């Protein structure tokens, strides 16, 4: 179970539950200036258990107001992941007096049999309270395990609602006029999935390319745990087109494309009803999330990130950048080697050719980022408390695979990089966000020094909340 750490590891600007467990972000929706975050939640313990939907709201994605649990388990199952439809035109017929229903589309998971089916619930009071639809499930299980995590969206091509969900090792697409009656329209993934494992937490988004001829592409996002060979929990993405019925991959690659080369970004999805794709991910690796030393709570979310596409020599690749934190960055100033730290929430702006950056404390603990002309490496092998690895089945992963990670750079030569550190969570955005890493660390004492060497110019800014 989650252990009481040697100190408080709760971040300052990343979402965490008030107490107990959270994992996947769910039902992300932006309505009338309010960002709604629903999330997988066990309100009774700091470890994974019967899933509910927790709920929080924000005006800036940094400051959050916690609200009561939104969805509770029922006779069909516990409340697994899903998404939210803002039914402005009342296609569902749930509105009674002119309201605009918020309709949660989620997976009900039977804890005894493992059966997973898709259900809906609606709210007429801005997402505070939900009524389960009497006709649930709206998509019955077709006889397959791992049938979950629907992502609903309005389909302009067909003038209907569509959703994508994970079904074993592939994605399936469904369409509906009223959010109640669904028809399967297509599949994607059989034969193209380069990682042989179960898919989950699918998302389908339309993203600008920056190319006046292409305009935009569609990106299919898929989370997956693949123990054994690499022992990682990653988020793969595919670049392609959506014809209104199904997805086709147009960027054929020899290797999988990953959203993040770190260890602690999983089940990430984007906000609905917003004019740009804004992403949140679960900021802990599911392989060891039950054992991290955070005490009264377990789990956090990444910083919000805006997604876009960049055309590289190898084709279109996803870029991510922090979203909504500009006003919380204090002025940046140059720093030299061995710069003392006066805060546990800060950012580093890095330019140069090659070198090494380390965050260190007086106990000899450090987390290291190393940059070369063609790669970036993050190393947390000496970052602090690593005892949470001891509780995980070694058959699932090799410890060394979750301590050091290297990615190639899509833009060789001088690097531009932003590093954001928040008490126990490190985020790296390099080359405009073409290479991104998310890493949990649990130092026994706060990091006190930034150490640099090599051909790098580093500026530091503090983060005010």
Regions found by a protein language model. Name each.
Residues 1-150, 154-199, 208-261, 283-333, ...:
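Beta-rich carbohydrate-recognition and catalytic domains
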Residues 211-214, 239-465:
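Beta-rich accessory regions
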């Amino acid at each position: 179970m989650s252990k009481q750490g040697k100190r408080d590891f709760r971040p300052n600007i990343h979402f965490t539950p008030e107490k107990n467990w959270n994992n996947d972000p769910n039902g992300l929706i932006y309505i009338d200036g309010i960002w709604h975050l629903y999330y997988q939640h066990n309100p009774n313990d700091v470890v994974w258990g019967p899933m509910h939907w927790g709920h929080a709201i924000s005006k800036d994605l940094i400051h959050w107001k916690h609200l009561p649990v939104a969805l509770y388990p029922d006779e069909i199952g516990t409340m697994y992941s899903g998404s939210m439809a803002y039914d402005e035109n009342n296609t569902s017929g749930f509105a009674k007096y002119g309201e605009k229903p918020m309709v949660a589309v989620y997976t009900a998971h039977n804890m005894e049999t493992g059966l997973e089916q898709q259900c809906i619930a609606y709210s007429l009071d801005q997402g505070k309270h939900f009524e389960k639809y009497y006709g649930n499930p709206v998509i019955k299980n077709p006889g397959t395990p791992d049938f979950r995590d629907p992502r609903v969206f309005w389909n302009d091509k067909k003038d209907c609602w569509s959703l994508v969900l994970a079904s074993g090792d592939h994605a399936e697409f469904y369409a509906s006029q009223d959010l109640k009656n669904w028809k399967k329209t297509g599949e994607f993934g059989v034969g193209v999935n380069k990682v042989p494992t179960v898919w989950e937490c699918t998302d389908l988004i339309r993203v600008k390319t920056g190319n006046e001829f292409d305009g935009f592409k569609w990106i299919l996002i898929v989370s997956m745990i693949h123990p054994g060979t690499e022992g990682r929990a990653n988020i793969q993405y595919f670049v392609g087109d959506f014809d209104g019925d199904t997805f086709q991959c147009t960027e054929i690659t020899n290797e999988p494309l990953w959203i993040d080369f770190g260890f602690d970004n999983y089940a990430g999805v984007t906000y609905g009803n917003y004019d740009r794709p804004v992403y949140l991910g679960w900021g802990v690796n599911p392989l060891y999330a039950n054992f991290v030393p955070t005490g009264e709570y377990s789990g956090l979310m990444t910083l919000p990130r805006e997604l876009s596409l960049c055309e590289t020599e190898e084709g279109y690749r996803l870029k991510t950048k922090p979203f909504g934190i500009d006003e919380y960055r204090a002025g940046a100033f140059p720093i030299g080697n061995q710069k003392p730290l006066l805060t546990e929430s800060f950012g580093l702006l890095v330019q140069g050719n090659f070198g090494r950056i380390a965050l260190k404390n007086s106990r000899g603990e450090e987390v290291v980022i190393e940059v070369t002309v063609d790669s970036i490496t993050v190393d947390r092998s000496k970052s602090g408390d690593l005892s949470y690895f001891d509780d995980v089945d070694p058959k699932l992963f090799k410890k060394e695979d979750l301590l050091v990670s290297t990615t190639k750079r899509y833009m060789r030569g001088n690097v531009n990089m932003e590093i954001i550190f928040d008490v126990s969570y490190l985020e790296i955005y390099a080359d405009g966000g073409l290479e991104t890493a998310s890493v949990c660390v649990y130092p026994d004492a706060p990091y006190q020094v930034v150490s640099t060497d090599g051909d790098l110019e580093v500026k530091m800014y503090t983060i005010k909340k």
